């Protein structure tokens, strides 16, 4: 099924004349500069920041093909929540124990979760991305699929540059415009990033204290419940109506008591209180319906908080899986 989806993607991906797209992009860019001026951004910042902005066709290809759409859950988890990554997290915790202990105490976010996010987002800072973020955001703003979202992100980024909180020369990251050790979008930088080392710059790539504290602040402010569970992998012993099953990350629905899930034939949850509430998530049903053995998870409130970080069912399960692996090792 996955191979079929990839083939469909390759066959249906639109092919345009690159030169004609560049002409249209440059027309759009001129209009965007006017919009940026109306947002109160200085002409100097607009010109300096956008002078090298260009249309990146590769960004559109990345946008149309994302692992969340084509990898099944078990493959997704196995590639990311690895033993080698867990051991690397353990070594980094030993090296930076004072920082992680301090941040956990201050923000009430477990060090294991922060290490898991760091490991999955950028392999602990090794893969922060090499794309020109301004060009990436400009390309995605010009593109029709999510133009409004990315245009807002680009405006926010220009404002941060204008306020001298971000150095434009450091802005290299992911194809989607995310930046630094924990891959913050501009809106996340604006809302949650912290100058933790007090040098009057937010340095999410160069400064580990800034990066870790900013990630903890983000998770804390979106409502993370300290030392509470994220999910529990379960088995289904009989069919369950699809109305009870979450296959979309947009909003987790149908929280029910553990006692009800037991009556529905879900096993391996004896250690959880019958009064606790959880929702049933089966990520693969959305894409790979013929997979009758799709992994199933009962998820709790904290799982939804991870989805606010990255709205992907598989990402949420994978982060919590790696966090549990790290916790069991240290």
Kindly give the residue locations of the regions a language model identified.
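Short, functionally critical alpha-helical segments immediately adjacent to catalytic or ligand/cofactor-binding
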Residues: 36, 45-57, 108-125, 157-161, ...
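C-terminal soluble interaction/assembly domains
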Residues: 234-330
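Acidic, glycine-anchored loop motifs typical of Ca2+
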Residues: 196-204
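Substrate-binding/active-site groove segments that recognize
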Residues: 132-141, 154, 179-194, 215
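Sec-dependent N-terminal signal peptides
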Residues: 4-13
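An acidic, Gly/Ser/Thr/Pro-rich helix-cap/linker signature
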Residues: 22-95, 101-104
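Boundary at the C-terminal end of the N-terminal hydrophobic targeting segment
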Residues: 17-19
């Amino acid at each position: 099924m996955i191979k079929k989806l990839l083939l469909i993607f390759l066959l249906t991906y639109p092919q345009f004349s690159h030169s004609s797209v560049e002409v249209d992009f440059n027309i759009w860019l001129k209009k965007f500069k006017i919009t940026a001026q109306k947002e109160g951004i200085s002409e100097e910042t607009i010109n300096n920041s956008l002078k090298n902005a260009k249309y990146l066709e590769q960004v559109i290809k990345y946008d149309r093909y994302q692992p969340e759409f084509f990898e099944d859950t078990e493959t997704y988890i196995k590639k990311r929540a690895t033993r080698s990554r867990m051991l690397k997290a353990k070594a980094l915790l030993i090296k930076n124990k004072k920082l992680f202990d301090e941040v956990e105490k201050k923000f009430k976010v477990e060090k294991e979760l922060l290490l898991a996010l760091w490991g999955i987002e950028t392999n602990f800072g090794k893969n922060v991305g090499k794309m020109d973020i301004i060009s990436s955001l400009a390309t995605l703003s010009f593109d029709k699929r999510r133009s409004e979202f990315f245009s807002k992100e680009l405006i926010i980024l220009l404002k941060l540059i204008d306020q001298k909180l971000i150095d434009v020369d450091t802005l290299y990251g992911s194809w989607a415009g995310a930046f630094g050790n924990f891959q913050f979008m501009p809106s996340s930088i604006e809302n949650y990033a912290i100058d933790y080392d007090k040098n009057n710059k937010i340095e999410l790539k160069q400064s580990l204290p800034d990066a870790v504290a900013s990630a903890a602040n983000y998770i804390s402010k979106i409502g993370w419940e300290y030392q509470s569970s994220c999910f529990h992998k379960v088995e289904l012993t009989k069919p369950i109506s699809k109305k009870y099953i979450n296959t979309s990350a947009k909003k987790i629905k149908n929280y029910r008591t553990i006692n009800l899930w037991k009556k529905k034939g879900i096993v391996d949850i004896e250690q959880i209180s019958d009064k606790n509430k959880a929702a049933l998530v089966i990520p693969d049903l959305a894409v790979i319906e013929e997979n009758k053995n799709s992994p199933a998870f009962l998820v709790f409130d904290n799982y939804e908080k991870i989805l606010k970080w990255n709205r992907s069912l598989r990402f949420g399960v994978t982060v919590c899986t790696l966090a549990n692996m790290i916790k069991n090792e240290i």
